[in-house]
């Protein structure tokens, strides 16, 4: 499959996801990933579609794959935190959330050396 075809499948997956068609979105993400198996944007989308469809174990599996590919991706850790929380695994959710906060802080330090460190888990107001 060409990279252009993979991009088309990815765009279709985004559309389906936006329409709440999670199963079909996952199928389109799978097609996109056939050409580019390490495409983290598509993996992120697939994980979200799995989670929104109630398939939290699959979402966690894909989230872990993203972390394997890019351990410094704060969004991957944030997503894993959310997936664990939805599954009721609060301790794991907090661990991943802490990793995400620390990675985001390190990125902020590159732009703002005086940025304060992140607070402990639960120190931010989260709207669900």
Residue ranges and their predicted role:
Residues 67-74, 78, 82-109:
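TPR/TPR-like (Sel1-like) alpha-helical repeat modules
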Residues 18-28, 53-65, 87-99:
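Structural signature of tandem alpha-helical TPR/SEL1-like repeats
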Residues 1-8, 112, 125-127:
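TPR-adjacent "capping" and linker segments in tetratricopeptide-repeat scaffold/adaptor proteins
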């Amino acid at each position: 499959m060409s990279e252009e075809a993979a991009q088309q499948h990815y765009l279709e997956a985004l559309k389906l996801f936006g329409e709440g068609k999670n199963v079909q979105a996952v199928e389109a993400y799978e097609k996109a990933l056939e050409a580019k198996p390490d495409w983290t944007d598509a993996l992120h989308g697939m994980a979200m579609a799995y989670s929104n469809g109630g398939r939290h174990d699959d979402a966690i599996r894909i989230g872990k794959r993203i972390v394997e590919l890019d351990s410094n991706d704060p969004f991957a850790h944030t997503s894993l935190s959310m997936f664990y929380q939805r599954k009721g695994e609060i301790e794991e959710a907090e661990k991943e959330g802490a990793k995400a906060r620390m990675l985001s802080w390190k990125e902020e330090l590159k732009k703002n050396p005086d940025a304060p460190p992140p607070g402990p888990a639960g120190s931010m107001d989260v709207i669900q």
